[in-house]
A protein has these predicted regions:
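Conserved segment of the thioredoxin-like fold in thiol-based oxidoreductases
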Residues: 1-20, 25-35, 39, 154-195, ...
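Thiol/disulfide oxidoreductase modules built on the thioredoxin-like
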Residues: 25-33, 41-72, 181-186, 192-238
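Short, ordered coil/turn segments that flank beta-strands lining enzyme active or ligand-binding pockets
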Residues: 38, 117, 214
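C-terminal partner/receptor-binding element of secreted or periplasmic proteins
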Residues: 64-97
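N-terminal "domain-start" segment that seeds a small globular fold
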Residues: 90-124
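Short pre-active-site segment immediately N-terminal to redox-active cysteine/selenocysteine motifs
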Residues: 130-132, 137-140, 205
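Conserved hydrophobic packing residues within short motifs/helices of P-loop NTPase cores
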Residues: 134, 165-167, 210
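Conserved redox-active cysteine motifs that mediate thiol-disulfide chemistry
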Residues: 136-153
């Protein structure tokens, strides 16, 4: 985005806002990230991004780490800026209605067809009756490591009443295995495929945490690694784990 803004010296200023601290995001009901606004218009919502692009319903710029996806985003963003600078903000607003930004709400733990790193299948039925915490992460994500270390302490605290699934995206298997062995073997580690990520509404940022109550209903979704993560999640788990 900074690269695109730099094409318009003196006309476009790039501003980065932290997730959870954006008035524009609150105004549009944006609950995840990334999201891109141009002159007050939401031109790319979180649902347009994602780490997988080969499944039905994938966003326009998924898979995001693909060079072609990033090139398309830059072209589209340049076009939006050009229209606004030409006095055609109405076109941009018409092409990006506010209701299109509605987040995908995940009501309950989806069906799972995964195999963990030890070769054991992970199935939703096997998790029934327990609180389930699902963490999507990546080996190249610095905040993910500290969050994963914390998950190990949660497993020690709650034992078998809490199932923790650490699902890696966009990460080489040897590195995933190495990190899993170094961090906590009691957490169930697996590599998420496209279908799994899509069943969670696609994953547009890491880390992303889902907490499900013993009945399987979604209790909390946490995007990123906010400074109050422990304060958000620990009391919730205390109330759910019985």
């Amino acid at each position: 985005m900074q690269e695109v803004a730099a094409r318009y010296p003196g006309k476009v200023t790039f501003v980065s806002e932290n997730f959870g601290g954006s008035k524009l995001a609150d105004q549009f009901g944006v609950k995840g990230y990334p999201a891109v606004f141009v002159d007050g218009v939401l031109v790319a919502s979180p649902r347009e991004f994602g780490y997988f692009g080969e499944v039905e319903g994938a966003g326009r710029y998924a898979p995001w780490r693909n060079a072609a996806s990033q090139a398309k985003f830059k072209d589209d963003l340049s076009r939006m800026i050009d229209l606004i600078l030409a006095g055609r903000k109405d076109v941009v607003t018409r092409e990006h209605p506010a209701d299109a930004a509605a987040p995908r709400e995940l009501a309950a733990l989806p069906a799972l067809t995964l195999t963990d790193l030890s070769g054991r299948p992970i199935a939703r039925d096997d998790l029934a009756g327990r609180v389930v915490l699902v963490e999507f992460w990546a080996t190249w994500c610095p905040p993910c490591r500290s969050t994963l270390e914390w998950l190990g302490t949660l497993k020690s605290k709650y034992g078998d009443k809490l199932a923790i699934l650490a699902l890696a995206v966009e990460s080489p298997e040897p590195t995933v295995r190495s990190m899993a062995a170094a961090l906590d073997p009691t957490v169930r580690w697996a590599i998420a495929d496209a279908a799994t990520a899509q069943s969670f509404g696609d994953i547009t940022a890491v880390p992303t945490m889902f907490v499900f109550d013993p009945s399987g209903k979604t209790a909390r979704v946490v995007y990123g690694a906010p400074p109050d993560l422990h304060e958000q999640v620990t009391p919730l788990l205390d109330s759910l784990v019985r």
